[in-house]
A protein has these predicted regions:
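N-terminal glycine/serine-rich phosphate-binding loop of ATP-dependent small-molecule kinases
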Residues: 1-83, 129, 136-158, 172-177, ...
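C-terminal, non-catalytic interaction/recognition modules in large multi-subunit enzymes and RNPs
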Residues: 11, 141-145, 149, 280, ...
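Conserved phosphate-binding loops in N-terminal lobes of ATP-dependent enzymes
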Residues: 17-19, 28, 32-36, 41, ...
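Glycine-rich phosphate-binding loop of actin/hexokinase-like ATP-binding domains
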Residues: 20, 29-36, 83-89, 109-111, ...
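Glycine-rich beta-strand-to-loop/alpha-helix junction loops that act as flexible
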Residues: 67, 162-163, 191-193, 242-243, ...
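Short, ordered loop/turn segments at secondary-structure junctions
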Residues: 87-90, 163-165, 193-195, 242-244, ...
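Terminal amphipathic helices with adjacent charged low-complexity linkers/tails
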Residues: 157, 161-207, 211, 389-391, ...
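Metal-dependent DNA phosphodiester-chemistry modules and their immediately adjacent helices/loops
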Residues: 192-213, 217-229, 489-518, 522-523
């Protein structure tokens, strides 16, 4: 086993990306994703990249994996047969959801269906209050009466979500003990473990989602681990989480819901490291793959994080129309605009792109695998942006004729456009959609865009980055080496980490550091034990945050908490930090209002070495073209002959005169 060979694999909707770092030398590969058996694509990518580096699986010291399997399982509703056990009177909280409508003007609004149907939402009598005081002891006979029902319904997995279990988990644990004794093969999720936070709907939804995907994810992880071992790998396997850290397979088996947005998190980490290398304070990360595009604001090299995420939105990108999850996640906006997104003309004669995707099977029309829809990739091929012979490292041969035929049928004939203009129109629409998403995201975060640098990666982002930067008023674009597998490269820079969250209501006017210090000690011990199991002996760092708001508000903002023993004076420190954060977001503070804290979070992670800073770029000769081909020029709205340059031939300081 080598100490320097590290491998990462990112499964996307269209391609599975592999990155291998051997002593600082990077080897990459892309293979088509195999949706029916994702591990097949993983193994194909691994077998393709190892010989390039001249090593075997036995030489690997580290493997990290990110996957969309959990997300797809929820969206496609292909998870386990799941039941929910809830406090009597509260089993419908997961279906009632929020009191407000995400679209108040649509009288035919469709809410996302719960993962657990009503006949499998089973009540038990018990009750705790918000402070954890037991008002009604658990009626254990109610739990035992559920056993034959669970057997009869052939339930594979159960979510246990009792009212106020975040404050006292005694009843949830007792329910689990009774069920485990009677049904030892049953998968059990406790809401007090996966989401020990206030807010009943989100906690229940998160627990149900974890239970829904757990059997499938556990089976997949066990199978993948066995396949890697059979290939000769002897090193540990880590999973990328949605919060931007790595975790062990065992932890991922218990909390698979934390893997939901693992792929995009790797891209944000890559962009953050590039920002630090280049000395950039503010950047916009732009990751466009085969199925979706992700946009993330990064300040001081650190992506913004959140505790909320929605999956399976019923209305295109409408907040509130999906299933809410309370998990650590990197804050980003995601739209269904990838290389495989299908373009069509709607009833009003407008070009719409996505969210439907051709995926990897059958793929865009130019793949020649039976796909007939006109996709963004087909438009890029028709515009001369993609070499038909060099796509995915030459592993996929493209057909420009099939691209043009699909565009003619879907767009050109319906809008009376010639072929190139139809392709250009598709490209313009997808770039405008992404630019609008970036603008809205920046406004929601109280951030500006014009002064930022755009970092573009993913299989499709570099093709659209310059036009998108122009629309956003940005004057610098960075396309890193290995951009096509950017998320997989980002995995290799991620720390081993774990986040612990606790809901503990506190008012700053009555700040109690003793109780908080005890809570933080317990949280630290829990997180450190998990991180140490994956990185024994490694130096660790700790970060604490509080979710704060003015009394009476319905949303919180994140404030850093000193990672040390708190004292009474820290109440004033937190108040000042909150006022500053609130003013940055909303343009003012409200000094007369009292501040409260609902939730506290602590993360422990290994310390990633800082990336080397880029020194002054030396002057170099002009780059030499390897050839030329026809390229559609947006300003001329016509084709021009443009030089072609190989990315590997470009060295720091070289210049290229466009269009190229």
């Amino acid at each position: 086993m080598s100490d320097t060979a590290r491998l990462s694999v990112d499964i996307g909707g269209t391609f599975t990306d592999v990155a291998l770092d051997v002593g600082g030398r990077m080897f990459t590969n892309k293979v088509l994703t195999t949706p029916q058996a994702p591990e097949e694509g993983v193994m194909a990518g691994v077998r393709a990249v190892l010989p390039e580096a001249g090593i075997t699986a036995a030489d690997l010291a580290f493997i990290v994996h990110g996957t969309t399997l959990a997300t797809n399982t929820i969206i496609e509703r292909k998870g386990a047969h799941t039941a929910l056990i809830a406090t009597d009177g509260f089993r419908d909280a997961v279906e009632m959801g929020y009191e407000h409508r995400f679209d108040q003007y649509d009288i035919n609004i469709e809410k996302p269906a719960p993962l657990v149907p009503r006949y499998l939402r089973l009540p038990v009598r018990e009750r705790c209050n918000a402070t954890g005081e037991i008002l009604l002891p658990l009626v254990e006979d109610d739990v035992r009466a559920l056993v034959p029902i669970l057997r009869e319904q052939q339930i594979e997995s159960v979510a246990i979500t009792l009212i106020h279990a975040y404050a006292n988990d005694k009843h949830e644990r007792r329910v689990a003990e009774i069920l485990q004794a009677e049904l030892p093969e049953l998968w059990i999720t406790l809401s007090s473990e996966v989401c020990p936070e206030i807010r009943e709907y989100e906690r229940t939804s998160t627990a149900c989602a974890n239970a829904y995907v757990q059997p499938l994810m556990a089976s997949y992880l066990a199978d993948l681990d066995a396949r890697l071992r059979a290939e000769g790998a002897q090193c540990p396997l880590f999973m990328m989480t949605s919060g931007g850290g790595l975790t062990t397979v065992e932890t991922a088996r218990r909390h698979p819901i934390r893997l939901v947005e693992s792929g995009p998190a790797g891209g944000a980490i890559l962009a953050g490291r590039i920002a630090l290398e280049c000395g950039l304070d503010k950047v916009l990360s732009y990751d466009m793959g085969g199925t979706t595009a992700k946009i993330c604001l990064i300040d001081e090299g650190r992506p913004q994080t959140s505790r909320t995420f929605e999956v399976d939105r019923q209305y295109r990108f409408t907040k509130g129309s999906g299933l809410p999850l309370r998990i650590p996640v990197i804050e980003m906006v995601e739209i269904g605009a990838g290389g495989g997104s299908i373009a069509q003309v709607d009833n009003l004669g407008r070009i719409q792109v996505g969210p439907e995707s051709a995926g990897s099977e059958p793929g865009p029309a130019c793949y020649g695998q039976g796909g007939t829809g006109a996709t963004v990739t087909d438009a890029d091929v028709a515009l001369g942006r993609i070499s038909p012979d060099g796509f995915a490292g030459g592993s996929v041969q493209l057909s420009p004729e099939l691209s043009q035929a699909a565009l003619d049928k879907a767009i050109a004939q319906k809008l009376n456009l010639d072929g190139p203009l139809a392709a250009f129109a598709v490209s313009e629409m997808v770039e405008e959609n992404m630019s609008n998403a970036a603008r809205v995201h920046a406004v929601e975060q109280g951030k500006e865009l014009a002064a930022r640098t755009l970092i573009a990666f993913g299989g499709a982002a570099p093709l659209h980055a310059c036009r998108m930067a122009e629309k956003l008023g940005m004057d610098r674009v960075i396309i890193p080496t290995g951009a096509g597998v950017g998320s997989a490269i980002g995995f290799l820079a991620a720390p081993v980490s774990y986040d612990v969250v606790r809901s503990r209501y506190s008012r700053l006017a009555h700040f109690e550091p003793e109780g908080l210090n005890k809570m933080f000690t317990e949280m630290h011990d829990e997180a450190q034990a998990i991180v140490a199991s994956g990185a024994p002996g490694a130096a660790l760092e700790e970060r604490r945050i509080a979710y704060m708001r003015y009394i009476g508000q319905g949303h919180e903002i994140v404030v850093e908490v000193p990672a040390r023993a708190l004292v009474e004076a820290d109440g004033a420190v937190l108040r000042a930090a909150y006022d500053e954060a609130y003013e940055a977001l909303f343009g003012r503070e409200i000094a007369s209002m009292e501040v409260e804290i609902l939730t506290w979070a602590l993360s422990v992670s290994t310390i990633a070495p800082p990336p080397p800073r880029q020194t002054d770029i030396p002057e170099a000769a002009a780059a030499s073209a390897s050839g030329e081909r026809k390229l559609f020029d947006a300003d001329l709205t016509d084709f021009v002959m443009a030089p072609v340059y190989q990315r590997d031939d470009l060295t720091p300081g070289m210049t290229v005169q466009g269009p190229a």
